[in-house]
């Protein structure tokens, strides 16, 4: 999934237009509540105390607070995260919006209008076939449906709590379309797409994807002293509170436990308190506050739609205000290698990026075996995954 590069479709080939698209929403959000700065200056970082007094006082575990834009900044080993939330209307016969598309920049529709966007889609919202190399995409669908197709011949439909974890490796084309399967009611969509880097040793592995179906993802429900629900924690990657997420793909940086990669989605009930347990020294840990109106980490106010970089070695007490709040936690040991990204490719050197483009234009990373780039499956199709080796997974609903 990409947000700032143009794709021009010519038969069974795609031309990548590297002209960047100005993201007005990101520019706006980047200034929201912060004036001209995107980083909150924490008061305790500018103390007038003496050196001896400073040595006696514990440093606050929140290192930095940053505003969130359309693409959320992340720390190594992650590359970035995008939070898509669209209130799609009823679907039409083609599983596109049963609404006028007039006034939209079809093919590059990233401005919210009437509560939703078409993205790169022309008929159905989503992201028609496009290439990747050198990293992984982790697509966490909170609500709605995603149809997958790729250049290996694999395909799938997933949603409503499912997660697709795709290793692009040496190169793959894939499409991610958002079919509006209901003609009788609205089709709301919410998902995160997280880009996780691959180390140099794994950048040219065979493409692969794994499905983490919603019934395999551990969910912890915590209650307060009165027995009332206080927090719901989904463990998408890694380990938290002695619960382990499903295994990631075999070549993932997350597959080695010593890398402590974690992806945790946490819902906090009104007026609740939650303790996020410590990880280990060296891990990069960031908390993304994406829903709610009042949140404190160790008694420090965190503005809505901001991220807090925190000390991974500290247990953190998170206090919620009088409405439901939601946070996403990303953590992991850094890969600590050079990162060179150009469009859909992430490698270690400029020469490798150039080679990625040359290989793509020569091979199309296996070509596109589907009848169209904005491939969607039949409306009545249930959730499924068909892998490149022919294995099929079928799910109800």
Question: Across the structure, where does each feature detected by a protein language model lie?
Answer:
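C-terminal segment of N-terminal export signals and the immediately downstream linker at the start
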Residues: 16-17, 22, 42-63, 376-379
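C-terminal flanking tails of non-heme Fe-dependent oxygenases
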Residues: 305-307, 311-319, 324-397
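N-terminal, Lys/Arg-enriched amphipathic/low-complexity engagement segments
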Residues: 57-140
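Glycine- and acidic-residue-biased ligand/ion/polar-headgroup-sensing regions
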Residues: 133-149, 153, 162, 169-170, ...
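Conserved metal-binding segment of the jelly-roll/cupin
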Residues: 158-173, 303-314
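Ligand-binding loop in jelly-roll beta-barrel domains
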Residues: 169-201, 312-341
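N-terminal export signals
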Residues: 27-47
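N-terminal secretory signal peptides
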Residues: 1-27
């Amino acid at each position: 999934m990409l947000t700032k590069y143009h794709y021009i479709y010519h038969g069974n080939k795609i031309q990548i237009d590297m002209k960047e698209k100005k993201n007005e929403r990101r520019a706006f959000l980047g200034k929201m509540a912060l004036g001209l700065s995107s980083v909150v200056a924490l008061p305790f970082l500018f103390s007038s105390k003496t050196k001896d007094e400073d040595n006696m006082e514990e440093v606050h575990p929140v290192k930095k607070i940053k505003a969130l834009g359309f693409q959320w900044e992340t720390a190594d080993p992650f590359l970035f995260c995008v939070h898509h939330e669209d209130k799609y209307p009823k679907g039409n016969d083609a599983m596109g919006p049963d609404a006028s598309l007039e006034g939209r920049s079809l093919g590059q529709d990233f401005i919210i209008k009437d509560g939703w966007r078409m993205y790169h889609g022309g008929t159905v919202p989503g992201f028609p076939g496009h290439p990747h190399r050198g990293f992984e995409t982790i697509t966490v669908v909170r609500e709605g449906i995603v149809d997958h197709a790729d250049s290996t011949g694999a395909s799938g439909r997933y949603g409503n709590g499912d997660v697709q974890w795709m290793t692009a490796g040496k190169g793959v084309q894939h499409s991610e379309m958002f079919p509006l399967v209901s003609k009788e009611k609205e089709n709301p969509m919410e998902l995160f797409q997280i880009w996780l880097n691959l180390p140099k040793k794994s950048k040219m592995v065979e493409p692969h994807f794994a499905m983490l179906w919603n019934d395999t993802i551990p969910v912890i429900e915590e209650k307060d002293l009165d027995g009332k629900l206080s927090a719901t924690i989904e463990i998408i990657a890694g380990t938290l509170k002695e619960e382990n997420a499903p295994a990631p793909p075999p070549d993932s940086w997350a597959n080695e436990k010593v890398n402590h990669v974690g992806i945790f989605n946490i819902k906090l009930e009104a007026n609740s308190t939650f303790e996020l347990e410590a990880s280990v020294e060296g891990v990069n840990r960031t908390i993304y506050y994406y829903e709610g109106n009042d949140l404190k980490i160790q008694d420090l106010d965190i503005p809505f739609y901001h991220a807090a970089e925190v000390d991974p070695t500290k247990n953190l007490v998170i206090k919620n205000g009088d409405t439901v709040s939601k946070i996403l936690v990303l953590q992991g040991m850094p890969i600590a290698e050079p990162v060179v990204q150009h469009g859909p490719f992430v490698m270690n050197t400029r020469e490798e990026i150039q080679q990625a483009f040359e290989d793509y234009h020569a091979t199309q990373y296996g070509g596109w075996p589907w009848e169209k780039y904005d491939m969607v499956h039949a409306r009545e199709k249930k959730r499924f995954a068909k892998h490149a080796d022919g294995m099929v997974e079928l799910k109800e609903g």
